[in-house]
Amino acid sequence: MMKKIILLSFAGFMMVTLTLAQMGQKESPVIAKGAKLIRLSDQYSFTEGPAVNKNGDVYFTDQPNNKIIKWSATDNSLSVFMDEAGRSNGMYFDKQGNLITCADLNNQLWQIGMDKKVKVLVKNYNGKLLNGPNDVWIDKKGGIYMTDPFYIRDYWKRTPVTEQDGQCVYYLSPDKKKLTRAADNFKTPNGIVGTGDNKYLYVSDIADRKIYRYDIGSDGLLTNRKIMCEKNSDGMTIDHLGNYYISNEKGITVFNPKGEQIEQIPIDEKWTANVCFGGKKLDKLFITALKSVYIIDMKVHGVR
């Protein structure tokens, strides 16, 4: 069956009805029956870093314009939460309701309160600038994992030469006092997400086209690296069944915990950057893709 795209304008939104190849043959294991992919907006420059708060609202970045945008789970509205957002990329909410962001302008990790006050959590490793924190995930203890690939940015004021001896994954202790290299041996680590039980951590190596799974140790260190699939991915999320979702030029691809592909959600964009679950019941998949943001109803839900 061919993919069919129908665009319907209404109330400032755009609905994209997708007939997927597998739909019509069998019911999707993750997408709600009859669900439609809805484009909320295409007014941005490059969307990234979706993160859900305790109310189900999703915050995401319009990175080139240095803004953080809020999508309201209550009324479907979009509004600017913060200007001058440190060129934030990947983001995640902590238990206190602060937004933890990979502030790439000065290669830092920020904590942003809902009053918009900024606290710099990490600005270097062993006295040397980080490459550029890219994506972040927080465990149940409050420890923070972040990827640190090296992408040269045209807005940097620093010398465009790495000061680190690798592109790694770091772990910031729950008390925010100790930064440790949790895993290395990557070409370009990018997306990152952990399972709801905090047993496993997934990391995408976008340049090497691999998704790795690690065991999470009690000290935060990562062991038993395993290749789960050989795909490139920018962002990642996970649902309550342990299925993990990756984003790339093909849209969103879903794998079960065994690494078997179970769904493909095509996005009519050249690149899909990131994804998370949002909504009051965490049953909407929120997708950032170039100038646009999308949502689709799911039969599974996300985890915090």
Segments and roles (model prediction):
Residues 22-304:
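Sequence-structural signature of mature extracellular/luminal beta-sheet repeat domains
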Residues 1-25:
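Bacterial Sec-dependent N-terminal signal peptides
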